[in-house]
């Protein structure tokens, strides 16, 4: 998983680099206004901040603009172009690709089409032609047929999904073969606030956005694309002297999420041992949904006597003492904490 932060008004490139990231996503309007801003390195600093790619509103896309985007993406060594579909009519990308397919194939720069909706914070938000994953898949399939290669992929904007009360886990499952990017931003489901992940809770700390299950869904499909934090709402209000600390928090979130990806290889991938999971509640159900086929447990144990002798997704649930029935050198006991 490759991670970066989207540049936004008020956020400085120095903060992104000092915060630990190697990639910055650039809204193309910055390039249109002026050259890409540079950042100052400290003495002895070996960091390199690279352009992950450009973001651009699909509503403004034309064949000439597509050429300009591809040319500048190559110039700045970007890796993709992601198209924002908020308040956008249907058919725009298809029409552009019909005219530009050969050029896009020659450049070989991936183009990601993102989920979106119509509306504003004042009027509320409704579905548009790009709200459903099935529509995005149809667009990607059509464009890739025109290009005769896989050029167009899908980006899921978590915040936009929240505005329409979409199930992000289900969206990830639906487009797994096309999913190339996640735009990670948070809101309360009403306003397009673009805050940092984990910002919004309900009641006594219940997350409005189910980030852990979103990451679980990405692990399930073995996601290896881009995770870009587009948190312009946060950085519009953070004092400049605190920007680096906030970016470091984002970097810590990435490390924690990446740790969940590597957890599989570090802890579960021990084929010479019997996997025993400790805990047979909801987290065991979640484990079986995400990893059960790849790393099936030998059995599970639980402190709750009511669960002993039951099965969860075909896995026997036993008393903790059953662990001792398996020789120590043959067992791999893992606390189930999906």
Give residue spans per PLM region.
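Short amphipathic alpha-helices and their capping/turn segments at secondary-structure boundaries
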Residues: 14, 34-45, 68-74, 95-103, ...
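Conserved beta-strand positions in the central sheet of alpha/beta enzyme cores
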Residues: 25, 81-82, 112, 155, ...
């Amino acid at each position: 998983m490759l991670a970066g932060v989207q540049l936004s008004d008020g956020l400085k490139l120095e903060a992104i680099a000092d915060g630990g990231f190697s990639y910055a996503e650039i809204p193309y309007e910055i390039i249109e206004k002026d050259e890409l801003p540079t950042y100052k390195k400290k003495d002895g600093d070996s960091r390199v901040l690279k352009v992950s790619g450009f973001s651009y509103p699909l509503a403004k896309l034309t064949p000439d603009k597509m050429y300009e985007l591809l040319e500048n993406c190559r110039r700045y060594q970007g890796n993709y172009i992601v198209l924002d579909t908020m308040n956008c009519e249907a058919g725009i990308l298809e029409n552009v690709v019909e005219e530009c397919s050969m050029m896009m194939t020659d450049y070989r720069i991936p183009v990601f089409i993102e989920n979106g909706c119509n509306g504003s914070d004042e009027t509320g938000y409704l579905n548009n032609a790009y709200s459903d994953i099935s529509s995005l898949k149809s667009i990607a399939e059509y464009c890739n047929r025109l290009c005769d290669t896989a050029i167009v992929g899908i980006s899921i904007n978590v915040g936009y999904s929240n505005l329409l009360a979409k199930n992000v886990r289900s969206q990830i499952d639906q487009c797994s073969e096309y999913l190339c990017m996640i735009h990670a931003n948070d809101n309360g489901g009403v306003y397009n606030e673009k805050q940092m992940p984990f910002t919004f809770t309900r009641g006594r700390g219940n997350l409005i956005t189910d980030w852990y299950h979103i990451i679980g869904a990405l692990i399930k499909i073995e996601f290896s694309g881009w995770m870009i934090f587009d948190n312009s709402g946060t950085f519009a209000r953070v004092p400049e002297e605190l920007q680096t600390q906030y970016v470091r928090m984002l970097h810590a979130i990435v490390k924690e999420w990446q740790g969940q990806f590597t957890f599989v290889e570090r802890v579960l991938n021990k084929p010479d041992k019997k996997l025993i999971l400790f805990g047979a509640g909801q987290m065991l159900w979640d484990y079986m949904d995400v990893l059960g086929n790849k790393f099936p447990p030998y059995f599970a144990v639980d402190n709750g006597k009511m669960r002993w002798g039951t099965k969860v997704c075909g896995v026997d649930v036993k008393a903790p003492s059953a662990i001792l029935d398996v020789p120590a050198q043959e067992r791999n006991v893992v606390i189930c904490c999906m």
